[in-house]
Design a protein with these regions (language model features):
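Jelly-roll (double-stranded beta-helix
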Residues: 1-283
Length: 283
């Protein structure tokens, strides 16, 4: 165990060096428009959560998170920057009660029944969205998962706010990351799975490291607060789903495998709005 840990650290250092060497190339493909920090008072009707839902503390925290995410977007999502560290620190403060979020109540309102597979495998609540970011909440019922997927040329921070989640993550084995083509395997590095609760630090992924992950509810349902920079779109940042193929442990102790992408998926979430009647849409 100790030998594997030491070797993995060395490999990750090499990987980080390759990451730095290729950052300029990848950033040319990574679009995050510059903008001045947004104001909470300029939220439009398309936001799911209205200001009446927030107490004074939460208004301040949410506004700071959105403003900080704007600064991170301007820095092309440099995870080594002071701006990104400050965003992660702010995210670590968020709790379910701060968001007025209760997954159990959400499932009750939607008529979810435990172990009933006819319902969507996940709830989605949009908190804030523009062309540079998506701030949202995901809630995964007991025994369900968000399947293995990617975040093309995106970075993100996820903070567990209810329950416990098993997060299985993979990093690109080559840089710059290849384009995803249906049926063409992607070589990745396997990371040890993590179990996260609201007491843990937020999980982080970048365009290069831990960019693929699967999130599974452990025990009861789990909810997490998510910031994606920039958000998915229908042109160059579509979400792809994957299956794991050909896991291989090398002599160095580093596990690699192939992920087989599928551009089509019937996975979907139920939209859950904290104020209005929930609607259903597919993503």
């Amino acid at each position: 165990m100790m030998t594997t840990t030491t070797t993995t650290t060395t490999t990750n250092n090499s990987f980080s060096s390759a990451h730095a060497a290729n950052a300029t190339t990848v950033n040319k493909r990574f679009s995050a428009e510059s903008s001045s920090p947004v104001s909470l008072y300029k939220w439009t009707d398309r936001q799911c959560l209205t200001m009446e839902l927030w107490n004074n503390r939460m208004m301040s925290l949410i506004q700071r998170i959105i403003n900080q995410a704007e600064l991170v977007a301007k820095s092309k999502c440099d995870v080594g920057s002071v701006e990104f560290k400050q965003l992660k620190d702010l995210m670590n403060q968020v709790r379910a009660k701060d968001l007025n979020y209760n997954g159990s109540k959400a499932f009750e309102q939607l008529g979810y029944i435990e172990s009933d597979m006819k319902h969507a495998p996940c709830l989605y609540t949009e908190v804030y969205r523009n062309e540079r970011m998506n701030v949202c909440i995901f809630c995964v019922p007991n025994g369900r998962e968000i399947p293995l997927h990617d975040h093309p040329y995106m970075c993100g921070i996820m903070k567990i706010i209810e329950g416990k989640a098993l997060v299985e993550a993979y990093s690109h084995a080559t840089l710059p990351p290849p384009n995803i083509v249906d049926g063409v395997p992607v070589e990745v590095i396997v990371h040890p799975p993590l179990q996260l609760t609201c007491e843990d630090q937020p999980g982080v992924f970048t365009p290069y490291e831990r960019n693929f992950h699967r999130v599974t509810s452990v025990g009861d349902y789990t909810s997490f607060f998510d910031v994606l920079i920039p958000p998915y779109n229908k042109t160059n940042r579509q979400c792809h789903y994957f299956s794991v193929k050909n896991v291989d442990s090398s002599d160095t102790g580093v596990q690699k495998c192939s992920l087989l992408p599928s551009l089509s998926s019937d996975y979907y979430c139920d939209d859950y709005d904290l104020k209005d009647k929930p609607t259903t849409s597919r993503i």
